[in-house]
A protein has these predicted regions:
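NTP-dependent nucleotidyl-transfer catalytic core
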Residues: 1-252
Length: 252
């Protein structure tokens, strides 16, 4: 990280190559889900803004420096603890980057409230970010809103990367499409259709089942995603709603 922030050519080249792989994967996954963004902020473009604001806060006495040269915020008056903002070697942390990103977002889109949609394991992080932004003079700091959501688990239990029980989003979507195709075929809903039509219906039903099963649960709660249950053409499921809509359209 020290070499990266110092602009080391070799480290930056390796970083750029790896990032391109990651971004290409993100783009493909979002494309399959039908998701798009008006603007994307990269931490690599915002961390300097964050470091600048942290140093301003240090000069104004909002923050303090430890003997190891690291910079911290004392939030005990707010009922919290001490928060690291810059490491002793001068490199940034997530909070530094989020401060910089928030500043740029405000500059690009003058607002009075900023909304973050991030998992509930980051509740504390955004509580701290709101306080820090307010201390740094951003009037909308206290208006920061964190719309948290729970984690998605499988019937077999919680997904854990170290145990290899994590399901890739692309693999899950493909599995849902295949399950939708099999279920639709068993029920005779693909009879008389071309292969292209059948594949398109399976994609619409499969992804609809996945999205609806997740959306029907209170976003703040953890949930267990059951692929077989979600693809059912009866009950409170995406396929049932889609099927009902199609039937109503045929009547109209």
């Amino acid at each position: 990280l020290v070499k990266w922030e110092a602009g080391d050519p070799e480290v930056r080249a390796l970083w750029a190559m790896m990032n391109n792989w990651v971004y290409a994967g993100f783009d493909e996954t979002y494309r399959k889900m039908g998701v798009g963004f008006d603007k994307i902020y990269y931490e690599s473009d915002t961390y300097l803004e964050g470091k600048e604001k942290v140093m301003e806060g240090l000069e104004k006495g909002f923050f303090y420096r430890k003997e190891d040269n690291s910079v911290w915020a004392d939030l005990t008056a707010e009922g919290l603890d001490h928060k690291l903002l810059l490491r002793g070697d001068g490199t940034s942390v997530y909070m530094t980057q989020d401060i910089g990103t928030a500043k740029l977002r405000f500059q690009d889109y003058p607002i009075n409230k900023m909304i973050y949609v991030v998992g509930n394991e980051q509740n504390y992080h955004f509580q701290v970010l709101s306080i820090l932004l307010d201390k740094l003079g951003f009037e909308w700091g206290k208006g920061l809103v964190h719309f948290s959501y729970g984690m998605v688990e499988l019937p077999e239990g919680k997904m854990k990367s170290r145990e290899g029980t994590v399901v890739d989003a692309d693999d899950l979507m493909e599995a849902m499409i295949e399950t939708a195709k099999e279920t639709s075929a068993e029920l005779g809903k693909l009879d008389g259709l071309t292969q292209e039509e059948a594949d398109n219906i399976a994609r619409i039903v499969g992804l609809g089942a996945l999205k609806y099963f997740i959306l029907k649960v209170d976003a703040r709660k953890n949930m267990t995603f059951n692929p077989k249950e979600s693809i059912d053409f009866n009950g409170n499921t995406g396929p049932f709603i889609q099927y009902t809509y199609a039937r109503v359209q045929s009547v109209l």
